[in-house]
């Protein structure tokens, strides 16, 4: 079954229909020789094993084979999860530990995703864009090339409440720390959003906005460009 991940209602349908998962990992001491594992993955020998599987199946396995088990420790980090994390292995970007990136996210070459960043389903991150620590990009948020999304900033998602129009951050935009871009807002190319601002309406290209709600305070000038310089070395 196919889904259109640019449509919030299609994303919601996908989340509704997809099989939910509660994966667990078990460190186990015992003797599992000859034991039927079903779909549980098992690694190890010499009385020590690591098991991976769905919680219900693993729980049944542990109960039915308790006479063969000396001790075990079970770990899990989600419950009835609908969307897996993005596979990062083949992405040509710098992604630091602790970033949470869900599947169906697009990340451009030489992008930088810092610790604690959260990026939801359907988001698009352009080439050489930096998503700083603890920033949030909601469902279907679109960031262009060479954007800097400051620490703690939020680009609102458009999954709930659903909206056809995502947040769009055009190329070369700098968004300061803890700024909030509300649903459906477009930030024009080369503009600057001051730290702590709340942007409730579209921003044209080449301006600086600040405040709550954010207002245009000036055009981007050479002094502004010096203060908001993007460093290529951080993207290599």
UniProtKB/Swiss-Prot annotation:
GO terms for molecular function: tetrahydrodipicolinate N-acetyltransferase activity. Its EC number is 2.3.1.89. Transmembrane segments: none annotated. It comes from the Bacteria. One of its GO terms (biological process) is lysine biosynthetic process via diaminopimelate. The keyword Flavoprotein does not apply. SUPFAM superfamilies: Trimeric LpxA-like enzymes. The keyword DNA repair does not apply. It catalyses: (S)-2,3,4,5-tetrahydrodipicolinate + acetyl-CoA + H2O = L-2-acetamido-6-oxoheptanedioate + CoA. Keywords: Acyltransferase, Amino-acid biosynthesis, Diaminopimelate biosynthesis, Lysine biosynthesis, Repeat, Transferase. Disulfide bonds: none annotated. Pathway: Amino-acid biosynthesis; L-lysine biosynthesis via DAP pathway; LL-2,6-diaminopimelate from (S)-tetrahydrodipicolinate (acetylase route): step 1/3. Belongs to the transferase hexapeptide repeat family. DapH subfamily. Catalyzes the transfer of an acetyl group from acetyl-CoA to tetrahydrodipicolinate. This is 2,3,4,5-tetrahydropyridine-2,6-dicarboxylate N-acetyltransferase.
